């Protein structure tokens, strides 16, 4: 899920996505054209327009997808001449979507390294904005699997003491990045509980990194200490089946792992190599074979 403050404009985007799902790219484009005629290239229109590009990409029309990506990027940049990026919650969504679209077009054309270089340049440009995690997510999707696991900050545990990833070498680790407001995360909880029941004795460990968002229930602003207490309460009540699971409270983890989507799941093998990087929910049926494969590798040799 995306945070409530970053949710896309519901009606227009929903209609465009429905047209895409029906395979009607012309209808999706017509909806955006009509909204543009009425309102101009507003951030809302640009978010919807990015979905037209994503629909074209899914349909294999790379030229159209690329053209929409460039148009959305240019129009978002034009809006930035009159406002800050985060002055409007929809503007970073539109700009981020255009960058993501252009990178995915490059990948579809076989230019993976060029896509990574492009994403890194954009991340360098927008590193101190709300887009940074989304850009890091896209970099990770293209490059993280098969590489050593990035460090995990463990200085602020919530409840149980936090082991470092290095201390867990020899076990298979499933990182469950979650948020206190995230209903999809709560639905993921029973899946993880079932996996721990099945594979915990064989060497599976779950760690649940999270972060502060500056508010608690109902969007009420909260001081860091108050939000930490609220997060602990949500964890205790909504994830009772995962009692004893270490919880790391640190925004740096979400930034490093590109967690603009919650839940995000990262599976690490016994040697500390990432075997899965997956923004979004996964079923037990999808996760179990991956966990079994990682467990079957056996522990690394002792030195």
Where are the model-predicted features located?
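Thiol/disulfide oxidoreductase modules built on the thioredoxin-like
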Residues: 238-244, 248-292
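TPR/TPR-like alpha-solenoid signature
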Residues: 13, 47-50, 93, 100
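Short active-site neighborhood of thiol/selenol oxidoreductases, capturing the structured segment around
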Residues: 161-186, 192, 206
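Flexible helix-coil transition and linker loops at the boundaries of alpha-helical arrays
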Residues: 2-5, 36-45, 76-92
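Structural microenvironment flanking redox-active thiols in thiol-disulfide oxidoreductases
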Residues: 187-238, 246-255
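N-proximal helix/coil linker or "cap" segments that precede and/or mark the start of modular domains
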Residues: 108-155, 166-169, 300-303
């Amino acid at each position: 899920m995306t945070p409530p403050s970053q949710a896309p404009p519901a009606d227009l985007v929903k209609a465009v996505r429905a047209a895409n799902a029906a395979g009607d790219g012309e209808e999706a484009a017509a909806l955006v054209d009509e909204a543009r005629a009425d309102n101009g290239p507003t951030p809302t229109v640009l978010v919807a327009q990015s979905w037209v590009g994503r629909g074209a990409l899914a349909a294999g029309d790379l030229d159209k997808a690329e053209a929409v990506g460039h148009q959305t990027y240019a129009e978002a940049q034009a809006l930035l001449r009159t406002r800050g990026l985060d002055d409007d919650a929809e503007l970073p969504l539109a700009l981020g979507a255009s960058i993501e679209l252009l990178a995915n077009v490059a990948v579809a054309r076989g230019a993976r390294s060029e896509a990574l270089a492009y994403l890194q340049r954009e991340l360098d440009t927008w590193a101190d904005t709300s887009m940074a995690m989304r850009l890091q997510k896209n970099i990770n999707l293209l490059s993280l699997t098969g590489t050593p696991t990035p460090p995990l900050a463990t200085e602020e545990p919530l409840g149980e003491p936090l082991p470092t990833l290095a201390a867990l070498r020899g076990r298979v680790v499933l990182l469950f990045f979650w948020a206190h407001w995230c209903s999809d995360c709560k639905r993921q909880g029973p899946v993880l509980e079932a996996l721990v029941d099945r594979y915990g004795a064989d060497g599976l460990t779950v760690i649940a990194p999270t972060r502060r968002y500056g508010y608690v229930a109902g969007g009420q602003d909260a001081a860091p200490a108050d939000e930490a207490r609220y997060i602990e309460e949500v964890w205790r009540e909504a994830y009772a089946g995962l009692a004893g699971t270490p919880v790391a409270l640190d925004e740096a983890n979400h930034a490093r792992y590109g967690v603009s989507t919650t839940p995000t799941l990262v599976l690490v093998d016994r040697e500390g190599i990432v075997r899965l990087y997956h923004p979004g929910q996964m079923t037990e049926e999808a996760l179990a074979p991956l966990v079994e494969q990682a467990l079957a590798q056996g522990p690394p040799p002792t030195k």
